[in-house]
């Protein structure tokens, strides 16, 4: 397994048109019905409040969700793949790097599309693209590995990692070897086999089918990125996207640090066990390390193992856990191990600036 290349950028953004009137959004719905490109996903029993979605603009990189209500605000969210929108052709692996010029160009395309979907009153536009609110951005890193890499082993490592406080696992049934996600209401972190995902949707170009690409993605909703990136609500779209792009590595690294509190090699379980047993560490420390190693390997993951370790050894001070992680680091062993059938260790993932710059594609 060899990491060949690291690409980073923004995959998707979501722009929201809010405070629309009922009749304004109805014009757009009528047009999408005429085009045979709208689907209702929710309606109350009186059809007072309903949610719809449309793929009418998907070839140009936009998916729409529409919310229409008699007694609440009406709005449309536009999930935009900037790379596809700007080039006019589907870009399965391109990641967007914002500039002032391409943000203006993107907004120009959006203005044309508002007219096309009849988002207007008396032939006049009802809003300008710069009035849209940025409601989400997906900060993304693609790790391109050599073709002998088993990505399912890497994803398994994430499944065995430390679950951060306030986060919950999200599962895709039958996709455990290809997908990992943890989330709160405002932030999600995903790790998945990008080529597998493209193939499942029959959207993988032939030239990429043998590639091994692990995608790491932090998706932040508005309140999260305003707080974490130090942005103001009045900041324009370029300022927000530029700040997001500049913080891709930091956002991903923050999750990696939480998931993997020790930075040693992920070794096959028997080898990790042997290194601890043969070390010159205190026997009581070795006992606790082996306990944690075993529980992590056989259980749900490092967070569950840590809880059992605290109960078994009557640990109250959380600093003792971090001290134990330092003992793992001394041996260059990670408590999250590979299965016994795997032959080679895997370095703990690290997105240092040096690591990224060395493997960034040449411009």
Region spans (language model):
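Structured, helix-rich domain cores that form ligand/interaction pockets
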Residues: 1-308, 312, 331-363
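Helix-turn-helix DNA-binding segment
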Residues: 318-321
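Residue-level detection of the helix-turn-helix DNA-binding "recognition helix"
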Residues: 326-330
């Amino acid at each position: 397994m060899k990491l060949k290349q690291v690409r980073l950028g923004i995959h998707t953004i979501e722009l929201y048109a809010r405070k629309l009137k009922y009749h304004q959004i109805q014009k757009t719905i009528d047009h999408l019905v005429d085009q045979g490109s709208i689907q209702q996903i929710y309606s109350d029993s009186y059809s007072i409040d309903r949610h719809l979605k449309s793929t009418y603009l998907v070839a140009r990189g936009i998916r729409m969700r529409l919310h229409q209500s008699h007694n609440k605000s009406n709005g449309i969210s536009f999930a935009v793949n900037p790379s596809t929108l700007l080039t006019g052709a589907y870009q399965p692996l391109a990641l967007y790097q914002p500039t002032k010029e391409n943000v203006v160009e993107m907004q120009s395309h959006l203005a044309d599309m508002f007219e096309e979907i009849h988002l207007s009153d008396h032939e006049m536009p009802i809003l300008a693209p710069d009035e849209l609110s940025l409601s989400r951005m997906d900060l993304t890193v693609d790790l391109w590995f050599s073709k002998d890499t088993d990505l399912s082993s890497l994803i398994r490592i994430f499944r065995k990692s430390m679950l951060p406080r306030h986060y919950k696992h999200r599962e895709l049934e039958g996709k455990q070897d290809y997908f990992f996600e943890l989330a709160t209401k405002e932030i999600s972190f995903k790790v998945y086999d990008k080529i597998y995902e493209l193939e499942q949707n029959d959207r993988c170009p032939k030239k990429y089918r043998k590639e091994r690409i692990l995608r790491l993605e932090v998706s932040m909703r508005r309140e999260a990125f305003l707080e974490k990136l130090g942005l103001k609500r009045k900041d324009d779209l370029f300022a927000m996207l530029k700040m997001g792009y500049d913080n891709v590595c930091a956002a991903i690294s923050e999750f990696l640090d939480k998931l993997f509190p020790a930075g040693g090699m992920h070794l096959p379980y028997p080898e990790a066990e042997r290194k601890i047993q043969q070390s010159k560490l205190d026997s009581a420390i070795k006992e606790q390390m082996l306990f944690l190693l075993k529980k992590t390997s056989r259980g749900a993951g490092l967070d569950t193992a840590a809880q059992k370790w605290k109960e078994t050894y009557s640990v109250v001070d959380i600093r003792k856990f971090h001290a134990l992680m330092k003992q793992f680091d001394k041996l260059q062993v990670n408590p999250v191990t590979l299965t016994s059938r795997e032959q080679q260790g895997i370095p703990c993932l690290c997105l240092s600036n040096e690591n990224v710059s060395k493997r960034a594609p040449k411009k």
